[in-house]
């Protein structure tokens, strides 16, 4: 694994990570992490994918991890999407002709969907883990608060993520809870408002998506409700598959060993079915 940086169009410092295979890559996979976390939480998954001869890369979204920006605050969700596309285009230029896959978790899946819809010829396929596409699953009081306060008082708090919602593996819950690069503060209304706008946009554009998509989803997910995954499957017109994990929580790559192994196998199969 190696690290580097890039500067986005706003000249913000973006912390980047790369997991390179020994040989010339068979595919490129960009990992788009979720809200409040960072690319380092995908080290194990990225290393496993890289061992298959795939170049994996990622970055900390602005306002996350080691990247610049006010923590968990964004004035335009589209900046997340823009930065991902910038990073992918940069790496793809070094490996022309190598297929590119998006792997997005939660909010990172929302970013991935928007990136793929805006750039249909850039990506070969997507893998969405616990995709955040269903704002209806958010408690109604928090939903109204985010909408009303997002513009008027963007720094007001509207809720907080519960560490226990991450995984059934309590060791993983502990690691999440005490990770200094994870944002443990309450979610701000301005950030929540932008995320809600993005999820609403995603629901509208799902029928237009033509990028083949694999969805991995747990049934005991309090953050990205399983109904969002079913909504995508019902309304999308692209080649799509879904794998449901009974009882699994939000971070499938941090779940029980059985789930983690299955997730890795599903990702491997999905990618290599599309790599010549």
From Swiss-Prot:
Gene3D superfamilies: alpha/beta hydrolase. Belongs to the orthopoxvirus OPG043 family. This is Monoglyceride lipase homolog. It comes from Monkeypox virus.
């Amino acid at each position: 694994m190696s690290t580097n940086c890039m500067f986005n169009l706003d000249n913000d410092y973006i912390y980047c990570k790369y997991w390179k295979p020994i040989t010339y890559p068979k595919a490129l996979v960009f990992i788009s992490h979720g809200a409040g976390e960072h690319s380092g939480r995908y080290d194990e998954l990225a290393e496993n994918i890289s061992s298959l001869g795939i170049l994996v890369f990622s970055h900390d979204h602005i306002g996350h991890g080691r990247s610049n920006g006010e923590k968990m605050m964004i004035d335009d969700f589209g900046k997340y999407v823009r930065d991902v596309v910038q990073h992918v285009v940069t790496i793809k230029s070094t490996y022309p002709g190598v297929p590119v896959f998006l792997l997005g978790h939660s909010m990172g899946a929302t970013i991935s969907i928007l990136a793929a819809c805006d750039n249909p010829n850039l990506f070969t396929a997507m893998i969405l883990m616990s995709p955040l596409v269903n704002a209806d699953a958010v408690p109604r009081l928090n939903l109204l608060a985010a909408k009303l306060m997002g513009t008027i008082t963007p720094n007001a708090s509207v809720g907080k993520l519960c560490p226990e919602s991450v995984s059934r593996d309590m060791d993983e819950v502990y690691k999440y809870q005490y990770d200094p690069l994870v944002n443990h503060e309450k979610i701000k209304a301005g950030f929540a408002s932008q995320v809600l706008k993005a999820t609403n946009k995603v629901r509208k554009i799902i029928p237009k998506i033509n990028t083949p998509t694999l969805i991995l989803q747990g049934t005991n997910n309090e953050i990205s409700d399983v109904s969002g995954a079913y909504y995508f499957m019902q309304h999308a017109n692209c080649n799509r598959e879904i794998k449901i994990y009974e009882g699994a929580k939000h971070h499938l790559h941090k779940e029980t060993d059985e789930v983690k192994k299955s997730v890795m196998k599903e990702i491997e199969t999905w990618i290599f079915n599309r790599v010549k």
